[in-house]
Amino acid sequence: MSEPNADSVTIHIDNMLRALSSAPSEPTILRVSVQLRSTNPKAYDPEIIAIGPFHHGKVQLQNMEQHKVKYLKQLLQRRNESSAERYVIAMREIEDRARKCFGEAIQFNRDKFVEMLLLDGCFVIEFLRKFQEKDFRDKDDPIFRYRHIQGYLLHDLMVIENQLPFFIIDLLFNMTKMDHQDINYIIWPLLQIGRSFFPKIDIHEIPEAPHLLGIVHDIHCSSFAEIKYYIESEYNTEKIDSAIGLQEAGIMFRKSEENSLFHIKFKNKALSIPVWEISDVTESLFRNFIAYEYYFTGSNKKHVTDYVFFMNCLIHSPKDAKLLRRNGIISNILGGDDMVYRVINQLGKNTFISEKFSYSKIFHAVNNHCGRKRNEWMVKLRRGYFNNPWALFSVLAAISMLLLSIAQTTFAVLSYSHDLKKDS
């Protein structure tokens, strides 16, 4: 290789090394990987609003840009402020820190980036405030005139690529809060999107998380996270059978009244599972929770991933979904059992047993039950004969013939014995 080429390579590598040393080691807002996105790309895209830089400028999201400016204006008017200067100054002071939170170089100049932080951050806070306080709403505000728009916005705030660093939200909230408000005040509306999955939620304190999606995830998982459900083992956890297969092995399914969706128990040959509502928001919300766990929780706290893996083991077909629905475990508002199967099957793609799998104890106990010889024999008998009415009829007929043959033989022996006694 010639010396000039060597010099150009050296220069190029040195530039890469310098860029690497100045880059954040752990960005907190990332784009979803190709593998995760491939199963359902729409689940990771906002519907109507871009928050943060990743989806900024998309044509289909432009209508909401004017509402960001309107909400900032209404905020300033409510606070009797004529200028946004102090907020711009605050955003400039943390611009560099905010840039390092994103997993790629943001191609905005300094002014554009600061403007985005301010408009997006204030919109998020004002929308959540107005969601709580009707007195803050403008009577002509279409966002609160049409309920479906609120639903879209709540959805978009739970998209992993559509986030701002939480310290931006926290700073702007504290700069604009009223006396009776704390940060819990604006978190509560975000919990409503998952209220059908996590019905009983109390916010004692805001968990440390990089953004709003992470906070909502951690709140929903908090009660379950305190329980050590996994077992340390040198062996890999084996999958359990489908719901139909477990039923054939003598395992019953019961609806649980636990507060947390994730609190599954196995006792006295019964799996107790809380109700899971399958709706039009299920797949998107759970996919973004799974993506958050994939990137940010390391080997711990993969509770949503573990739960989806568990349910994906149980539901291998629409028949499994039907069995769980009939036992009150699945609440289906999408349509038929085939839709439930499709959603859970799709959610289960690219999910794996985590290092500290939340349900390893349950899997171990269930597989122990199903592995006993008498249970294996019963499974084979049920699968081979009792699932087919004609096969069952044949078995019963054969048993009847056997009993009849035994009776005839017994009668013949007794008759012969009686005749011998008579002759003697």
Question: Where do the model's predicted regions map?
Answer:
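Membrane-interface recognition of transmembrane alpha-helix starts
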Residues: 374-410
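Acidic, Ser/Thr- and Pro/Gly-rich low-complexity regulatory segments
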Residues: 1-386, 413, 417-424
